[in-house]
């Protein structure tokens, strides 16, 4: 068999060693091959030799990287601290802009502040609404390009601003004129760059990396963001292979204790001694602090929820399209306001439509009504 790992850099650091060891075992003892794909490749050769099977055979499929620069579609520029109003004003200078921020609350605040033609995307919105908005964005971008092929003299009322969380960075096919990315890990910033001049129709385009002046120092001092800041000062081009390699080398060095605490030790060569149950219980790709919340949006979803209420069983798969994500505290607030219930099934649903907006997502206070 051939196993393809897309976005391989997203393997969780806490369980990196068991992941790599599992891949190494599969390739050796089950006579398979593994292909790692990513635009931001860590030094997996070094990591596999250190944390998995040292004598594993590793081959780089692309040995000559000298032509990479020819395919570079954007340049990355760090602009430092900027206020929300300055950021939005600067975005409106371009035919189409994408702002990507680290927090859902920030995305919503910017959307509410933003004027003109604007779009908002976050997991506060259901998958149903995110797909609908993305379809509308693609249509608008396509029409904008048709009307202004050179993007010259685009009137203000036709300029597009998209405000999103990191959900737009992978698997979303959008091509905008300019991207503004709040400082975070280098891997995320380079993924954000993939939405800028995606089709390479212009010689170059800009991805601006910024810090929000409204954020506290603590909010932007996580390890990945701090590493990125140092690399932005050191490298003129942060998409350079050397920069990416240094980023991961330093990141994994900083996280060595996290990696080693869940190591599948070499003494576990006997399958019976591998703690499968412990790994299964602790291994998480999805943040456990987030909870799914079903928001009925049409007759089909309402019928599914009604069935769930009376049968006390829920079909999570069928409801997936109508599901958004909130924190446990946010869910508790909704329950306290009698706006959410699980009807004894463990699948929580929004019970009051006033607590949801199709463009903003879940609201945590119902709108005020005046008679």
Predicted segments with their positions:
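Conserved catalytic network of the ASCE P-loop NTPase/AAA+ motor domain
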Residues: 1, 25-31, 92, 142-156, ...
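Interdomain hinge/linker at the junction between the two RecA-like core domains of SF2 helicases
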Residues: 25, 40-93
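Conserved two-lobed SF2 helicase motor
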Residues: 150-169, 181
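C-terminal helicase lobe and adjacent C-terminal extensions/tails of nucleic-acid helicase motors
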Residues: 27, 85-94, 105, 109-112, ...
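SF2 helicase motor core recognition
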Residues: 160-176, 191-199
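Short glycine-/polar-rich loops that comprise or flank the Walker A/P-loop
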Residues: 1, 30-32, 69-74, 116-117, ...
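Hydrophobic residues in beta-strands of the RecA-like P-loop NTPase core, especially within AAA+ ATPase
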Residues: 4-5, 101, 164
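Conserved helicase ATPase motor motifs in RecA-like P-loop NTPase domains
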Residues: 2, 7-47
């Amino acid at each position: 068999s051939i196993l393809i790992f897309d976005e391989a850099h997203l393997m969780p650091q806490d369980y990196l060693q068991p992941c790599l060891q599992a891949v190494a075992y599969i390739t050796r003892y089950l006579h398979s091959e593994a292909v790692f794909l990513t635009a931001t490749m860590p030094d997996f050769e070094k990591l596999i030799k250190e944390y998995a099977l040292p004598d594993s055979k590793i081959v780089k499929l692309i040995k000559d990287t000298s032509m990479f620069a020819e395919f570079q579609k954007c340049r990355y520029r760090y602009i430092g601290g900027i206020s929300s109003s300055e950021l939005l004003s600067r975005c409106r200078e371009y035919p189409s802009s994408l702002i990507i921020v680290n927090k859902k609350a920030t995305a919503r605040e910017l959307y509410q502040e933003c004027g003109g033609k604007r779009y908002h995307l976050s997991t506060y919105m259901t998958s149903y609404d995110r797909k609908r908005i993305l379809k509308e964005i693609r249509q608008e971008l396509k029409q904008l390009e048709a009307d202004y092929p050179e993007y010259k003299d685009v009137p203000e009322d036709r300029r597009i601003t998209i405000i999103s969380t990191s959900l737009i960075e992978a698997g979303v096919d959008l091509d905008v004129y300019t991207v503004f990315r709040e400082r975070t890990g280098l891997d995320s910033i380079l993924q954000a760059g993939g939405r800028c001049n995606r089709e390479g129709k212009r010689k170059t385009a800009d991805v601006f990396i910024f810090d929000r002046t409204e954020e506290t120092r603590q909010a932007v001092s996580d390890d990945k963001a701090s590493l990125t800041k140092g690399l932005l000062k050191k490298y003129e081009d942060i998409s350079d292979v050397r920069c990416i390699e240094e980023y991961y080398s330093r990141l994994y060095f900083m996280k060595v204790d996290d990696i080693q605490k869940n190591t599948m030790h070499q003494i576990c060569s006997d399958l019976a001694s591998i703690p499968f149950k412990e790994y299964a219980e602790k291994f998480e790709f999805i943040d456990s602090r987030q909870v799914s919340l079903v928001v009925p949006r049409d007759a089909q979803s309402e019928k599914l929820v009604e069935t769930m209420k009376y049968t006390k069983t829920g079909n999570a798969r069928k409801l997936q399209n109508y599901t958004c994500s909130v924190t446990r505290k946010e869910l508790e607030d909704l329950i306290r306001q009698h706006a959410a219930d699980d009807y004894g099934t463990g699948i929580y649903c929004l019970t009051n439509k006033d607590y949801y907006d199709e463009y903003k997502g879940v609201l945590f206070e119902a709108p005020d009504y005046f008679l």
